[in-house]
């Protein structure tokens, strides 16, 4: 993704905040013809040396069947965005643009096959996304 240097965000606190406040993202992997894409809620697990993105795909999802350990992937999280009119500038020699916040997280996927670990992951995901509710599930 092209990001002009003056818009590039390097502060991990800001990057983590965008991911945590916009957890519904896209998981993309390569396939033979076109990229595979699944929209799903995910969760950031910020580690001391590296970060992980946790998520769950249903077994019935065809994308799931194409994922093996070590599959390269891209997770995309979108924040706020807005059209920018050239009328808003003092200098009228401008063109329209679009400002946006987005995080592209690249990494490799690991399947969780152990039922106990899978249940723990689902519990963590549910807890993360239920935590803002008055009566969590």
Positions of predicted regions on the chain:
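Binding-site signature for planar aromatic cofactors or substrates
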Residues: 1-137
């Amino acid at each position: 993704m092209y990001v002009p240097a003056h818009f590039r965000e390097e502060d991990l606190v800001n990057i983590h905040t965008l991911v945590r406040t916009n957890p519904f993202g896209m998981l993309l992997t390569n396939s033979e013809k076109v990229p595979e894409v699944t929209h799903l809620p995910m969760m950031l697990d910020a580690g001391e040396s590296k970060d992980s993105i946790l998520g769950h795909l249903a077994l019935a999802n065809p994308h799931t069947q194409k994922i093996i350990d070590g599959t390269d992937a891209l997770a995309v999280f979108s924040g706020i965005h807005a059209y920018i009119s050239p009328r808003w500038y003092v200098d009228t020699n401008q063109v329209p643009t679009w400002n946006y916040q987005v995080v592209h997280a690249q990494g490799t996927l690991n399947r969780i096959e152990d039922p106990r670990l899978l249940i723990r992951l689902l519990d963590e995901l549910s807890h993360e996304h239920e935590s803002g509710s008055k009566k969590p599930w």
